[in-house]
Design a protein with these regions (language model features):
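Alpha-helix N-capping/helix-start residues
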Residues: 20, 26, 58, 150, ...
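Short secondary-structure transition/capping segments
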Residues: 56-59, 92, 117-120, 148-150, ...
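Active-site beta->alpha loop and helix N-cap motifs at the rims of alpha/beta catalytic domains
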Residues: 3-12, 17-145
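A general structural signal for well-ordered alpha-helical segments in protein cores
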Residues: 29, 61, 65, 90, ...
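Alpha-helical structural signal in soluble globular domains
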Residues: 63, 67-72, 96, 100, ...
């Protein structure tokens, strides 16, 4: 599964399980990847925001990618997170991910230093020139304070190994404009579970999901129903899953997600600062939602 040029469907933005001493829980990670694949997920995305990549050292990021690639064993593509606001450092990460056997990269827009659209273009162009791996851009303005605009996405889509964008702007008009501006082969994916249905309805091809950590089969069914134009079923699934989608962000992600996965017995409820445990009332809401979906 090395060719992701036609990537579609649902991929999980994987959590990174930790032990109580804050080290990576490698055994839990291995089990979790196997769980995801057994439930029918289409691809895996380690070391993104949900994986707490800002708090992982370079060595830890390499180890997480190495484990996920090893356990996946070519059954599903592995698209490794390799982003940041230091272009030279991102290039280093990208090359490491390529060496470790990742099938592609997910690279978030530079945050905090607020580059211009030309700066964003040059940043991603430099990364693309430094690796042979296919790259999926990641636009998430609520987190980065910078918006990758349709003009810039269209320019970047001309670079051969920039093959898609994970869009989490929440602006369906912007997403539709991107889809209308890029080649048909360019992969536009939702970066927000709750935007999957509208994004695919205007021509998107899939989802990089947070909620699929808890319910990979359910989010895969939703995405597939949308892609196959089974809109009545898609709307029903969206209604069933919507509460969980939103609860995962009721406090700073991935704290609610890790609390839910701990209730499900998948991982320990351990995150690294500055992420802190959820409040008791949030825990109660999560427990109720998981029971409603028969996940606990």
């Amino acid at each position: 599964m090395s060719d992701i040029s036609k990537l579609s469907g649902c991929g999980t933005a994987l959590v990174t399980p930790f032990n109580e001493d804050l080290s990576i829980d490698e055994a839990a990670l291995r089990r979790f990847v196997e769980f995801q694949i057994s439930e029918g997920i289409n691809f895996l995305v380690p070391c993104g925001t949900t994986g707490e990549s800002p708090t992982l050292s370079d060595a830890e990021q390499r180890r997480v990618v190495e484990i996920v690639v090893e356990v996946a064993n070519r059954r599903v593509p592995v698209i490794a997170g390799a982003g940041g606001n230091n272009t030279a450092h991102v290039i280093k990460l990208a090359r490491e991910c390529e060496r470790l056997g990742a099938n592609g990269l997910l690279s978030v827009t530079p945050y905090y230093n607020k580059p211009t659209q030309e700066g964003l273009y040059q940043h991603f162009k430099a990364i693309a020139e430094a690796t042979t791996l296919p790259i999926i851009l990641y636009n998430v303005p609520p987190r980065t304070n910078v918006n990758l605009l349709p003009d810039t996405v269209a320019r970047l889509a001309e670079i051969p190994n920039i093959i898609g964008v994970k869009e989490a702007s929440g602006d369906i008009s912007q997403i539709a404009e991107i889809i209308n501006r890029v080649p048909a082969s360019f992969r536009v994916l939702s970066g927000d579970d709750s935007m999957t249905l509208p994004l695919i309805s205007v021509g998107g091809v899939g989802l990089i999901s947070v909620a699929s950590n808890e319910l990979p089969a359910g989010l895969t069914r939703l995405t597939t129903a949308c892609l196959e134009n089974r809109w009545e079923e898609a709307r029903r699934l969206n209604r069933e899953l919507f509460a969980l989608m939103k609860l995962n962000f009721i406090e700073t992600s991935p704290a609610p997600l890790k609390a839910a996965l701990a209730m499900m017995g998948k991982i320990k409820e351990v995150a690294r600062l500055p992420i802190v445990p959820v409040r008791p009332e949030t825990r109660d809401k999560l427990r109720a939602a998981l029971r409603e979906l028969k996940l606990i």
